[in-house]
């Protein structure tokens, strides 16, 4: 019986430490996968890379990073749902971004300037690398 009462605090401590360890590294794993996918996409020479997209980074100054990532996800979804190229990579990227982005946002295309898919992916890669360096 005495052994059990001594083990409980140790087990609780181990559980707390491991859960912190796992949650602390989730950011790294997700960001690594996003960066790898972005590296693959930006290295490709594909006509889809010149498709027009809303410039989600030309948002007002008070826009949060989560809103910007949400808008990027919306644009990626719009591309891979309406074009057959790069679907696997763009959907994977969208899925990974959704974990870092806010759940609701809007892209008002009438007021938003346009860019290309390649520019969107390059800027997203820069942001993700900066975020990874701080993780």
UniProtKB/Swiss-Prot annotation:
<dbReference type="GO" id="GO:0050728">
    <property type="term" value="P:negative regulation of inflammatory response"/>
</dbReference>
<dbReference type="GO" id="GO:0005136">
    <property type="term" value="F:interleukin-4 receptor binding"/>
</dbReference>
<dbReference type="GO" id="GO:0045893">
    <property type="term" value="P:positive regulation of DNA-templated transcription"/>
</dbReference>
<keyword id="KW-0964">Secreted</keyword>
<dbReference type="InterPro" id="IPR009079">
    <property type="entry name" value="4_helix_cytokine-like_core"/>
</dbReference>
<feature type="disulfide bond">
    <location>
        <begin position="70"/>
        <end position="105"/>
    </location>
</feature>
<feature type="signal peptide">
    <location>
        <begin position="1"/>
        <end position="24"/>
    </location>
</feature>
<keyword id="KW-0732">Signal</keyword>
<keyword id="KW-0202">Cytokine</keyword>
<dbReference type="GO" id="GO:0005125">
    <property type="term" value="F:cytokine activity"/>
</dbReference>
<dbReference type="InterPro" id="IPR018096">
    <property type="entry name" value="IL-4/IL-13_CS"/>
</dbReference>
<dbReference type="GO" id="GO:0005615">
    <property type="term" value="C:extracellular space"/>
</dbReference>
<dbReference type="Pfam" id="PF00727">
    <property type="entry name" value="IL4"/>
</dbReference>
<feature type="disulfide bond">
    <location>
        <begin position="48"/>
        <end position="85"/>
    </location>
</feature>
<keyword id="KW-0325">Glycoprotein</keyword>
<comment type="similarity">
    <text>Belongs to the IL-4/IL-13 family.</text>
</comment>
<feature type="glycosylation site" description="N-linked (GlcNAc...) asparagine">
    <location>
        <position position="96"/>
    </location>
</feature>
<dbReference type="GO" id="GO:0035771">
    <property type="term" value="P:interleukin-4-mediated signaling pathway"/>
</dbReference>
<keyword id="KW-1015">Disulfide bond</keyword>
<dbReference type="GO" id="GO:0016239">
    <property type="term" value="P:positive regulation of macroautophagy"/>
</dbReference>
<dbReference type="InterPro" id="IPR002354">
    <property type="entry name" value="IL-4"/>
</dbReference>
<protein>
    <recommendedName>
        <fullName>Interleukin-4</fullName>
    </recommendedName>
</protein>
<feature type="glycosylation site" description="N-linked (GlcNAc...) asparagine">
    <location>
        <position position="62"/>
    </location>
</feature>
<dbReference type="GO" id="GO:0008083">
    <property type="term" value="F:growth factor activity"/>
</dbReference>
<comment type="function">
    <text>Participates in at least several B-cell activation processes as well as of other cell types. It is a costimulator of DNA-synthesis. It induces the expression of class II MHC molecules on resting B-cells. It enhances both secretion and cell surface expression of IgE and IgG1. It also regulates the expression of the low affinity Fc receptor for IgE (CD23) on both lymphocytes and monocytes. Positively regulates IL31RA expression in macrophages. Stimulates autophagy in dendritic cells by interfering with mTORC1 signaling and through the induction of RUFY4.</text>
</comment>
<dbReference type="GO" id="GO:0006955">
    <property type="term" value="P:immune response"/>
</dbReference>
<keyword id="KW-0339">Growth factor</keyword>
<feature type="disulfide bond">
    <location>
        <begin position="27"/>
        <end position="135"/>
    </location>
</feature>
<dbReference type="GO" id="GO:0050776">
    <property type="term" value="P:regulation of immune response"/>
</dbReference>
<dbReference type="GO" id="GO:0042113">
    <property type="term" value="P:B cell activation"/>
</dbReference>
<dbReference type="InterPro" id="IPR001325">
    <property type="entry name" value="IL-4/IL-13"/>
</dbReference>
<keyword id="KW-0075">B-cell activation</keyword>
